[in-house]
Amino acid sequence: MSDLCPVYAPFFGSIGCAAAIVFTCFGASYGTAKSGVGICATSVTRPDLLVKNVVPVVMAGIIAIYGLVVSVLVSDSLSQKQALYTGFIQLGAGLSVGLSGLAAGFAIGIVGDAGVRGTAQQPRLFVGMILILIFAEVLGLYGLIVALLLNSRASQDVTC
């Protein structure tokens, strides 16, 4: 083992892999729970809006898929003999998609809850809610793009 390829280098890649799925699932579960509470509360008085108001829950679930994609890509490239550079890049990729997915899930949950409750009283608010949800979803997409770019550089010009 050299200084560039220590025995603990795969640890950082493993943490990146775990961070990608854990943080995005935290965000997705918060978004699902928060907007799900709003859907349940408004469906009592307006059951006709139930299917229409499921959009925030679906969008929150998509956030977890971003983390799954990066986690699978990082875990596929993990190896016992790995450069420290690769481990750090994989950690950065996992944190990138994970933390942006966490923030996006929080935003989707809060906007989804308020939007669903507002739509029950004024149906014209639905379009505005969808637009804001799209902007919140894009936050997670930015993290996915950065993670994919980082992961594509993880094994370039590195040998152990």
Curated annotation (Swiss-Prot):
Positions of transmembrane segments: 7-27, 54-74, 91-111, 130-150
Subcellular localization, as worded in the UniProt entry: Vacuole membrane
Species classification: Eukaryota, Fungi, Dikarya, Ascomycota, Saccharomycotina
GO biological process, one term: intracellular copper ion homeostasis
Site (Essential for proton translocation): 137
Subunit structure, as described in the record: V-ATPase is a heteromultimeric enzyme composed of a peripheral catalytic V1 complex (components A to H) attached to an integral membrane V0 proton pore complex (components: a, c, c', c'', d, e, f and VOA1). The decameric c-ring forms the proton-conducting pore, and is composed of eight proteolipid subunits c, one subunit c' and one subunit c''.
Record's protein name: V-type proton ATPase subunit c
Gene name of this polypeptide: VMA3
Cytoplasmic side: 28-53, 112-129
